[in-house]
């Protein structure tokens, strides 16, 4: 999965096999999940 570091704004690749989640560039622990660029439309009820 691709995340963005909240501190240095670098794109970080995270695997499930990693022990803990940290930015590989600055060591910060807060990562933001990247959203897809496609817009998903849902019909109204």
From Swiss-Prot:
HAMAP family, A to Z: RNApol_arch_Rpo12 (MF_00615)
Gene Ontology biological process terms, A to Z: DNA-templated transcription
Pfam families, sorted: Zn_ribbon_RPAB4
Gene3D superfamilies (UniProt xref): RNA polymerase ii, chain L (2.20.28.30)
Name of protein: DNA-directed RNA polymerase subunit Rpo12
Family, per entry: Belongs to the archaeal Rpo12/eukaryotic RPC10 RNA polymerase subunit family.
Domain of life (superkingdom): Archaea
Function recorded in the entry: DNA-dependent RNA polymerase (RNAP) catalyzes the transcription of DNA into RNA using the four ribonucleoside triphosphates as substrates.
Compartment annotation: Cytoplasm
Residues that, per the record, bind Zn(2+): 8, 23, 26
SMART domains noted in UniProt: RPOLCX
Catalytic activity: RNA(n) + a ribonucleoside 5'-triphosphate = RNA(n+1) + diphosphate
Cofactor requirement: Zn(2+)
UniProt keyword annotations, A-Z: Cytoplasm, DNA-directed RNA polymerase, Metal-binding, Nucleotidyltransferase, Transcription, Transferase, Zinc
Species of origin: Methanocella arvoryzae (strain DSM 22066 / NBRC 105507 / MRE50)
GO annotations of cellular component type: cytoplasm; DNA-directed RNA polymerase complex
GO terms for MF: DNA binding; DNA-directed RNA polymerase activity; zinc ion binding
Taxonomic lineage of the native organism: Archaea, Methanobacteriati, Methanobacteriota, Stenosarchaea group, Methanomicrobia
EC number: 2.7.7.6
Main location: cytoplasm
Cofactor details (free text): Binds 1 zinc ion.
Assembly mode: Part of the RNA polymerase complex.
InterPro entries reported in the protein's UniProt record: RNAP_P/RPABC4 (IPR006591), RPABC4/Spt4 (IPR029040), Rpo12 (IPR023464)
């Amino acid at each position: 999965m691709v995340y963005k570091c909240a501190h240095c704004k670098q794109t970080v690749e995270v695997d499930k096999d990693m022990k803990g989640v940290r930015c590989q560039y600055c060591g910060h622990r807060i990562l933001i999940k990247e959203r897809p660029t496609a817009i998903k439309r849902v019909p109204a009820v």
